[in-house]
Amino acid sequence: MSLLKTILNRRQKGKPFVHRDGRELSLHFSEPVVQSNMNLDQPDVLALGYTRTMMGFLLFVPEPKKISMIGLGGGSLPKYCYRQLPDSKISVAEINPDVVALRNEFLIPEDDGRFRIHCEDGARFIKNFCASEDVIVVDGYDIAGHAPSLCTEKFYADCYRALSRQGVMVVN
């Protein structure tokens, strides 16, 4: 199916969709803007530049024990952290169950003792932590852009409270 036909079909349904072009998979949210990209031959490689930039947190926290992420998308960042940081416990909040449902297509790991996806609002999710997170990664978008609940002063205060003493937060 052509990308245009897929977009028009999904736009009517209002759901995220996956487009395959050869060995590349991309995630879209009812428009032609790529939200995530994965090469099937190298599924753990961070294909988009912004994801490599966000991993700059390793300069400040080279061995994080606890990482909380808001926004799953195609799972590039959580998957990379899971594979490359074997001593890290990773929790991901994704508000959209239709995005979570695509996890197998993007080869995102199953939940286990050190990796878990929570289908909930990231702003509510982050309230569960207190001075415990070494890294908070915020990459939460909806069809219109940044999710409104992730743009409030209260959200940023909750993130600050959730960080460990040496913790860092990165925001796309």
Language-model features: where?
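The AdoMet/dcAdoMet-binding core of the Class I SAM-like
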Residues: 9, 45-46, 51-168
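Rossmann-like AdoMet
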Residues: 1-64, 83
